[in-house]
C-alpha cells in the first residue's frame, strides 16, 4: 500500500507498506498448469462473499481485501505462511506497479502535452487548446489508429522499474524506495524484485 512521499538527504522517496501478506493459494504445474503463489493483503472486516470465505478458510487466514498472484516465486513456503518486508534488502532494486491517479476526460493539451494552435491572431477564435488536423480527407477516408486525441486520462496501470530500496523497517512492515510510485495515498501497489 502506497503511504506518502518524503525526502531523505534531498532525494525524493516514497513510503510503502508491504505486509504482512498471507499465502492464500499455491498453484502447481500438475494441478493448475503453472506454478504461482497467491498473496492476500489488508484484512477485510465485512461484505465477504461465501465463495471467498471458503477460499480463505482453506489457508486458515482471515478474509483479505486484495489478492495478487506471483509467478516464479522462490522460497519454501506453505499455505497460510506470512510474507513480511524482510523479503527485501536495503540497496536492491525493485519494480513497483500501481493504478495512477485518475484525471477524468481531458483535452489534448493536458493529456498529451500539445501546444495548442498558438497565437489568437489571423482571425482565430476558440482554437487555443484544439488538437488541429487529425489527418487527410478523402484519400484515407478514415482516422488512423492511435491518433492522439482527448479522452480519459490517468486511472491506468503503470509499472515503475528499478527503484532503489533506501530503508527497510521490519517492525512496521515499511519499505522506503527512492523515487515516485504511481497512485494516490493508501492505494494498492505491487512490489516485485
Please name every model-derived segment:
Residues 1-8:
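Short, small-residue-biased leader/transition segments that mark boundaries at the very start
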Residues 5, 97-99, 192:
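A generic structural motif
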Residues 171-193:
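Long terminal accessory segments
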Residues 2, 21, 181:
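Short beta-strand segments in beta-sandwich/barrel cores
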Residues 12-166, 175:
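Basic, glycine/proline-rich low-complexity segments that contact nucleic acids
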Amino acid at each position: 500500500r502506497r503511504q506518502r512521499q518524503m525526502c531523505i538527504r534531498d532525494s525524493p522517496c516514497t513510503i510503502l507498506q508491504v505486509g504482512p501478506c498471507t499465502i492464500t493459494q499455491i498453484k502447481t504445474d500438475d494441478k493448475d498448469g503453472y506454478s504461482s503463489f497467491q498473496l492476500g493483503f489488508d484484512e477485510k472486516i465485512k461484505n465477504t462473499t461465501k465463495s471467498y470465505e471458503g477460499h480463505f478458510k482453506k489457508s486458515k487466514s482471515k478474509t483479505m481485501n486484495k489478492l495478487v498472484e506471483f509467478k516464479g516465486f522462490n522460497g519454501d513456503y506453505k499455505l497460510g505462511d506470512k510474507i513480511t518486508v524482510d523479503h527485501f534488502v536495503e540497496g536492491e532494486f525493485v519494480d513497483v506497479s500501481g493504478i495512477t491517479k485518475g484525471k477524468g476526460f481531458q483535452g489534448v493539451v493536458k493529456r498529451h502535452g500539445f501546444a495548442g494552435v498558438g497565437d489568437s491572431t489571423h482571425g482565430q477564435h476558440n482554437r487555443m487548446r484544439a488538437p488541429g488536423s487529425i489527418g487527410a480527407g478523402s484519400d484515407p477516408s478514415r482516422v488512423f489508429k492511435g491518433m492522439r486525441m482527448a479522452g480519459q486520462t490517468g486511472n491506468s496501470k503503470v509499472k515503475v522499474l528499478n527503484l532503489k530500496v533506501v530503508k527497510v523497517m521490519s517492525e512496521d512492515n515499511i519499505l522506503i524506495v527512492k523515487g515516485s510510485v504511481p497512485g494516490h495515498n493508501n492505494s494498492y501497489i505491487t512490489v516485485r524484485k
